[in-house]
Each structure stands twice: as structure tokens, then as C-alpha cells.
């Protein structure tokens, strides 16, 4: 599995419309993102002329890149990724899982899921899987163990304290030995750290996201029970309330009931994928 291939996915999931500190991000040799107008320039064919299937996947990622703008991680997604990072340094991790076919399947799924705005958590899934693929994709992962340990600790500190700036981590990465294939890993890691920093910075916007989803589910189920069946469509009738009962405020008024329902479904899908990875011995910290 090419480290550079995984890095292209990192570029897609790491860029946010909320990045105000920079106007342009360049991923060497393949992708240029101009944050000022959302314009994406790509020359993917030149990156790997001999692999049409891979180019087709990269083309899909590039085409849907703009749809991923503006959707940030939830705190839960950061914690799940943190757990995966810890597992990466476990010598007992099941290396055969990271075959090119399995990695391609995950990446294709994540790329398609970022097409719809309500699938914000798919970005976290794509990030986690692509980082695993990137680290396992080098010829000799053991040669990167010390640098990866330091990199992991920096990432954890970014999530927990928010005090470390990306530039500090970039400086650390300059000490990663440039063995064959490692240059791409360094670039991939820079995108990963930038995303971790931005995710921490804007985490307050979604700190109550899980509670909102839970309360919304309870409300919809209660409405269906009142109206007498599963075919009840929210919004077609006024909701009856008992004396003294107040209606919970809609904390996501910009989303339709269908979008909220899809968001809940996506959360469950991602949890199931992560659980399967955990059962395979990958997600143990």
C-alpha cells in the first residue's frame, strides 16, 4: 500500500473551511487547495500513470473534496482516533489486516460518505484508517518506531491541551530519518497534525453533539408513539405536550429531520466499523 496514496486521502480529510491561518495548502505533486475560493487544482494522473484503478479512486476523492469542507470532528471521534494511534505502536497488532485491498475498501467508503454534508463523522473514520495505512505501508515500520512514538505523544497533547502549535510538531518531524518511502510519511503526518490542531480548536462547536443526537432520537420515538405508528412524519402535525412540559430546543435548526436521522445512522455505522477493528486486535490501547 503506497504511503503517498494514503497521504492523498489525508489531504482530503485534513482541510477545513475554518482554516483561517493559511490561504493555500499544497500537497506535493498531486493536490493544491486554495482556501480563499475553495478551488481545487489536481494533476492526479501524473502522480501514478501506471495505475488506473488507483487514479480513479483519487479522482473520486478530489471530486468530493469541497463537500468535506467545514465539517469538523466531534470529541468522540477524536477519542476514537486517539485510541487507534495508541494501538499503532503495539507490536502484536495484526499486520495482515492492512492489505491493499482492505485499505482501498475503507478509503473508497470514506470518500463516498464525505459526499453528503450530514456524514461528518466519515471524515474521522477516513482520517483514522488512512493514518493506519500510512504507518503500516512503509517497508520497515520498526525503523520509524521512535519517531512515531514521539509523534503520537505530540498528537495526544494537541488533543488534550490545545497548547502545542503545528509548527512545533513540524519541527519534530524534520528529525524523522528519510529512508525510502519516509518522505511521504512525513508529509502525511503534517496534515494529520494540522487536522488534530484544528479539531481541538473548534471542538467547542460540537461538544454537545452526542447529547443532541440522543435527545433528538428520544423525541422522535416519543412522537411516533403518540401518533400511533412508525409511519409518522415529523413536522406534519403539531406535537401535543402534557401540562407543564416544555419542548426541547432544536440545537441544529439548519438540518431537516431526514438529515438528523442520517447523521445518527452514520454515527452507528462508524461505531460498528471501529468495533470490528477493535475485535481484530487493532484498537487495543
Curated annotation (Swiss-Prot):
Family per similarity comment: Belongs to the RxLR effector family.
Predominant place of localization: secreted
Organism domain of life: Eukaryota
Subunit relationships: Interacts with host RCD1 and SRO1 transcription co-regulators.
Protein name: Secreted RxLR effector protein 106
Keyword annotations from UniProtKB, A to Z: Glycoprotein, Host nucleus, Secreted, Signal
Gene: RXL106
Motif (Bipartite nuclear localization signal): 239-264
Glycan-linked positions: 182, 187
Signal peptide from the UniProt entry: 1-24
Organism: Hyaloperonospora arabidopsidis (strain Emoy2)
